[in-house]
Design a protein with these regions (language model features):
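Alpha-helical transmembrane-bundle signature of multi-pass membrane transport and export proteins
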Residues: 1-424, 477
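Long, low-complexity, intrinsically disordered cytosolic termini of multi-pass membrane proteins
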Residues: 403-479
Length: 479
């Protein structure tokens, strides 16, 4: 489960990230509560607007942020973004402590936080894979999610108590201090031990990433599922804060709900770390579980029963996000990883500006329970999309007389080897849905899926003359 800890760089990163993320969750709790109760009178629409401004920049700047993450030193990018976020937290703290903060000013700062995070997120996600060997990338992503959710377990509860005891301004001060842990960790990274980064031969930013994703039907499905739930189901600040008020709780009660959600989230992240690779079917089942758990939570009559169901909501949410993130990272061309992850983060974070205002309006007009049901319905639709794609992507053919079954679970890339090379690979039955790629056919070169053992090949297939066989399986339905 913890094999990525064998890398010194990842260990340093992990512990720095926990401290920084605790502060981040404390600040998130304080910001939501300030907008909902101090700057407005329980206005969920204003809270949705704040979330839209904070999470909108990743969508608007996706073409630039992904290219920056691919072209420049990711460690230095993170040093700049983390320092910027720390300075912004100090500014908000000063305005709150001097009692001059207004809703328009908070909206401006939310947008500034969003711009900084737009550059931080793809670089941060891609940098995780830079610190470990490729075979440990999925494990590192899952442990990174566990770190995030360990902080989510602690941060909101501590933040809620700090708001009641000290005031919201001091919570922003505390978050600014925790950024120092991440900055120190980045400075201690041994750059010589980072994984080499291949350069993509073609120039281009967003268009190159989009073209790559469009050529991958599996990624299109993953992005679609994550977008639906991200837009309508993952508006937890709105759901938890309005439900806390529904049950007549204060900031500490809201913080407890966020921490309870993190109990399930942490469990999901740790279980994901045990899996050796990300599977699309796990993503699909998690989406369905999220939909069911969300709808059930909306029906709970008491604060305690609602909190209990939130454990399952958190579990399914993080299982889905960790699986999707790991799948994207481990199946993407390393030279394009930053751009593809920028698109992924734009889908995850950029869905919020679309869904948060709608969720806020529904909560104001029909109550928070109705808004939660809408989010649950989005999870059911995402499950249906994943199930439909899996049904229609079953058996594929490499050629008419040599059939082999590809499942939808593999995260390892296809390897190009010399046709005369007699390399035995583990007979693991798993592979991604094949992707058509244009390759120049060179005599003596063939493509062999990693999951096919030499003993499984026919005598004809072992012969050198098979060098120019079709390198890509047929699409579904081409029997």
């Amino acid at each position: 489960m913890f094999r990525s800890f064998g890398a010194f760089n990842y260990r340093i990163w992990f512990f720095g990230a926990i401290i920084s993320n605790i502060g981040g969750w404390m600040q998130s709790t304080a910001q939501d509560w300030v907008v909902l109760t101090e700057l407005t009178h329980n206005d969920a629409t204003a809270m949705g607007a704040t979330m839209a401004l904070q999470f909108g920049p990743p969508l608007v700047l996706v073409g630039l942020t992904g290219r920056v993450a691919d072209r420049f030193d990711r460690r230095r990018i993170l040093l700049v973004t983390q320092t910027t976020l720390m300075v912004l937290a100090v500014c908000v703290a000063v305005l709150l402590l001097t009692h001059v903060m207004t809703l328009p000013l908070m909206l401006v700062f939310a947008a500034c936080f969003g711009v900084a995070n737009a550059f931080d997120a793809p670089a941060r996600q891609a940098f995780v894979s830079d610190m470990v060997a490729m075979e440990n990338a999925s494990n590192a992503v899952a442990l990174n999610s566990a770190s995030f959710n360990m902080a989510r377990l602690i941060g909101p509860a501590v933040g809620g108590l700090a708001i009641v005891a000290l005031g919201s301004g001091w919570v922003f001060v505390a978050n600014a201090a925790t950024f120092l842990a991440m900055i120190v960790a980045l400075l201690l990274i041994r750059t010589r031990e980072l994984m080499p980064r291949p350069k993509h031969p073609r120039a281009g930013g967003l268009l190159v990433g989009l073209a790559y994703v469009r050529s991958r039907p599996d990624l299109v499905v993953v992005f679609s599922m994550v977008f639906l739930i991200g837009a309508f189901g993952m508006n937890f600040p709105i759901f938890a804060s309005t439900m806390a008020l529904e049950f007549h709780k204060q900031a500490d009660g809201y913080g407890v709900l966020s921490s309870v959600l993190a109990i399930g989230s942490l469990t999901g992240a740790l279980l994901a770390a045990r899996r050796d690779r990300a599977r699309v079917r796990v993503l699909m089942l998690a989406a369905g579980g999220f939909g069911v758990a969300s709808i059930v939570s909306a029906l709970m009559p008491t604060y305690v029963s609602y909190a209990v169901v939130l454990v399952f909501v958190g579990f399914s949410t993080v299982t889905m996000l960790t699986t999707a993130n790991g799948y994207v990272q481990t199946t993407t061309d390393p030279a394009l990883r930053g751009r593809v992850l920028a698109l992924y983060m734009a889908v995850v974070m950029g869905a919020t500006p679309i869904g948060a205002p709608i969720a806020g309006w529904v909560a104001d007009a029909f109550g928070p329970r109705a808004a939660i049901v809408v989010g649950g319905a989005a999870g059911i639709v995402a499950f249906a999309i994943g199930a439909w794609w899996m049904v229609h992507s079953g058996r594929l053919h490499r050629r008419e007389d040599a059939r082999f079954l590809l499942t939808l679970d593999e995260t390892r890339p296809v390897r190009v080897i010399d046709a005369m090379q007699r390399a035995v690979t583990p007979p693991i039955t798993s592979a991604t849905t094949p992707i058509r790629t244009e390759q120049q056919r060179t005599p003596g070169i063939g493509v062999v899926a990693e999951d096919r053992a030499l003993d499984d090949l026919t005598p004809d297939e072992r012969a050198p003359g098979n060098a120019e066989r079709e390198s890509c399986p047929r699409e579904p339905g081409e029997d």
